[in-house]
Regions:
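Conserved structural scaffold segments of CAZyme catalytic domains across common CAZy folds
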Residues: 1-87, 97, 239-273, 283, ...
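Short, flexible, glycine/charge-rich loop motifs used to bind or transfer phosphoryl groups or to couple energy/partner
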Residues: 26, 105, 279-281
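Aromatic- and carboxylate-enriched substrate-binding clefts and catalytic-loop regions
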Residues: 35-219
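Composition- and surface-driven signal marking solvent-exposed, interaction-prone regions
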Residues: 128-129, 303-308, 368-369
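Active-site-proximal substrate-binding groove within the catalytic cores of carbohydrate-active enzymes
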Residues: 134-331, 341-356
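C-terminal beta-strand-rich structural cap/linker in extracellular carbohydrate-active enzymes
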Residues: 333-385
Length: 386
């Protein structure tokens, strides 16, 4: 899933403008967003203030309801999600039924893809756990693939109906909820030493790579999230991508598009030896492996990549392996014999993404030059570079 979490207490006009931005990103750079998720204040508010208690505000924010938003999202192949609380069922049967109908209607009428249950919007009373379970069951009749994020909440018997947990209870909100443990060139050094979810579990969430608080080197953080941890919502960003410079927009799009092209095989991951770099991971299907690694030091680092089972690569019939660098720029590094060792240079405090694949299935690409991808077609093929 390519996901964005955005917009605290937004409005219809603001949301339509934001979706227009992602239409531009799709048309200009080939980036496809799967889920656009509203933050708190677009259904439930903070401090246990549920939608039924703030209908006047919601009517002002969305005078036409969610229909124009859902339609605009659908036009660009996207679905909606929203933050909220797990309760809101009140103390009487009428309020309980209205709350359930509200949540079910989001899936039935607007095809919502995501509910984020956050403690900021309130907790779940024990006596309402059964009603929560019933509501989630009814919602999934209309959105069978509904993702329910659990942010720091005890849900009791409702726990199995949540899709994810918040990894380490920490949001990837730079300099707000997470920061560097040591001096570095930029504010995202923590990316390299943060670790991986135990067992490379994918049904977890890290709140998305926050752009609002720190745009610099978002791409390295996003690579570790999307190709390293590869959580269910990856690649996931949080905040305001329009804060990025114009020259950074194709970088964002390229990460989303490359991940989308190979997402079916990226679900298979393995941890690499420490010699490959901090928390390095290899993902793929044996014929094509993507290695995500980084450098958390002030010096250049040479990573020796063994082109064999050490990185999960099966032996090709041809005996040849193609090696492509995808980040921090794109470059065809050559074709080598299976079992050879290739040295990859990783810059200080930067991430690197390397593809190692059977030579016979390597994608056509320019040789003898380094470049940046500007646009990918819907099938993932690159048709514009610089």
């Amino acid at each position: 899933r390519g996901t964005l979490v955005c917009a605290v207490g937004s409005t219809e006009a603001q949301t339509l403008t934001n979706l227009e931005f992602f239409k531009f990103m799709r048309d200009r750079f080939g980036m496809q967003l799967d889920i656009y998720a509203w933050d708190a204040g677009n259904l439930d508010g903070s401090g246990g203030l549920y939608a039924a208690q703030r209908m006047d505000a919601l009517t002002k924010q969305y005078p036409n309801g969610y229909r124009p938003i859902a339609d605009a999202a659908a036009e660009i192949g996207c679905r909606l999600g929203v933050w909220g609380g797990p309760d809101g069922y009140g103390d009487d049967p009428k309020t309980e039924a209205e709350r359930q109908e509200l949540l079910v209607s989001l899936c039935r009428d607007y095809h919502f893809a995501l509910f984020k249950l956050d403690g900021v919007c309130g907790g779940l009373r024990e006596e309402k756990q059964a009603k929560f379970v019933e509501t989630m069951q009814k919602c999934r009749k209309y959105s069978p693939d509904l993702i329910v994020l659990n942010h720091r909440l005890p849900l009791g018997i409702g726990e199995p109906y949540a899709t994810t947990f918040l990894w380490n209870g920490t949001e990837t909100y730079v300099d707000v909820h997470i920061c560097n443990p040591k001096t570095a060139m930029h504010h995202r050094e923590f990316t390299f030493t943060r670790g991986n979810v135990p067992g490379l579990e994918r049904l977890a969430e890290d709140h998305g790579v926050c752009i609002s608080s720190c745009p610099e080197y978002f791409e390295d953080d996003l690579l570790y999230q999307a190709f390293g941890r590869e959580l269910i919502l990856a690649p996931e960003i949080y905040g305001n991508p329009w804060f990025l410079r114009d020259d950074e927009l194709p970088i964002l799009a390229s990460i989303y598009s490359l991940h989308r092209k190979y997402r079916a095989i990226l679900v298979h991951g393995m941890l690499l030896p420490d010699s490959y770099g901090p928390n390095a991971v290899s993902r793929g299907d044996g014929t094509r492996q993507f290695l995500c690694t980084g450098n958390d030091s002030w010096n250049m680092r040479l990573v020796k990549v063994k082109l064999d089972a050490e990185i999960g690569l099966e032996k090709p019939e041809s005996g040849k392996v193609s090696v492509i660098l995808h980040h921090p720029y794109t470059e065809f590094l050559g074709t080598f014999a299976y079992g050879e060792t290739v040295e990859i240079q990783v810059y200080p405090f930067r991430a690197a993404l390397v593809e190692c694949c059977h030579a016979e299935i390597a994608e056509d690409m320019p040789k003898d030059c380094a470049y940046r991808v500007i646009h990918r077609q819907t099938n993932g093929c690159v048709d514009e570079i610089e």
